[in-house]
Amino acid sequence: MSQEFAHLSVLLEETVGGLNIKDDGIYIDGTFGRGGHSRQILQRLGENGRLIAIDRDPQAIEAAKQFADDPRFQIVHGGFGQLADYVEELGLVGKIDGVLLDLGVSSPQLDDAERGFSFLRDGPLDMRMDNSQGETAAQWLARAEIEDMAWVFKTYGEEKNARHIARCIAADRDKTPFLRTKDLADLIARITKNKERNKHPATRVFQAIRIYINSELDQIDQALEGALTVLAPQGRLSIISFHSLEDRIVKRFIRRHSQGESVPHGLPITEDQINKSRKLRAIGKAIMPSDEEIERNARARSSVLRIAERLDY
């Protein structure tokens, strides 16, 4: 792998350590990427352990060949939202000792201009995690209604100027279609008046389009529910998120399943019954990267790690 597209796994020790790995355990790396977390898991597993890695990026599947000679490892080409389906096919429901998810876009995807994720590198406006199928960002921008674009920019990018940007895109695309990242980034920079300090004006819109094109938040919801289904008692969830939308979903999921089902006041139900509805317990507080890690890897700055354990009821 070229140095240009090298990937530094964020919160590596903390995330893998949070899985509390057993020698003969069965683990899932739901976001293989370039294998940083998988490598650490394999180093801690015994000879009877097992690691199932998942990724929908064809380049990640290619990178997984580095572990082809390790009988403990297997790679699945698909989205982590379907992890419960993959585990069911393998007959391992209720036997998984840990699930790791490193959410969002990876450094190699951002750094490769041909993938179209970055407003800093000119390339085709693609943004698909799996670039072998599905609609590209350029195709969506060419057909989307103004209202739909504004909703996506506001909901997934928390963009204050969502409607104005959507209108300008619609007006400009009739003359020249948006086919490259630079086309879109330049337009947003040109029409944005109140620019945020130390943040490119296109940051939020690019994030929003990427999340929409890849159904990222739906994938997270599905993966979390799936993990709850497949985890063994005392199995661990170790999840890194990179922006507030992701972290909010993870935080609320852990909180909801740590508190148990809410019941109307006065309903005749015992404390034991309420406890049995609890499926998770949070392990410690949210973990942030150290100043030293941020200095080594600026992309770690916004990362948050949350760890939870499946309860045995």
From Swiss-Prot:
Cleaved signal peptide residues: none
Record GO terms (molecular function): rRNA (cytosine-N4-)-methyltransferase activity
Statement: the UniProt record of this protein carries the keyword Ribonucleoprotein: no
Catalytic reaction annotation: cytidine(1402) in 16S rRNA + S-adenosyl-L-methionine = N(4)-methylcytidine(1402) in 16S rRNA + S-adenosyl-L-homocysteine + H(+)
Swiss-Prot/TrEMBL GO biological process terms: rRNA base methylation
Record bears the keyword Cytoplasm: yes
Positions annotated to bind S-adenosyl-L-methionine: 35-37, 55, 80, 102, 109
InterPro entries (UniProt xref): RsmH, SAM-dep_MeTrfase_MraW_recog, SAM-dependent_MTases_sf
CC annotations in GO: cytoplasm
Disulfide bonds: none
EC number(s) stated in the UniProt entry for this protein: 2.1.1.199
Gene3D superfamilies: Putative methyltransferase TM0872, insert domain, Vaccinia Virus protein VP39
Compartments (UniProt record): Cytoplasm
Keywords: Cytoplasm, Methyltransferase, rRNA processing, S-adenosyl-L-methionine, Transferase
Pfam families documented for this protein: Methyltransf_5 (PF01795)
Coiled-coil region list: none
Its biological purpose: Specifically methylates the N4 position of cytidine in position 1402 (C1402) of 16S rRNA.
Record-stated family: Belongs to the methyltransferase superfamily. RsmH family.
Protein's UniProt name: Ribosomal RNA small subunit methyltransferase H
Organism lineage string: Bacteria, Pseudomonadati, Pseudomonadota, Gammaproteobacteria, Alteromonadales
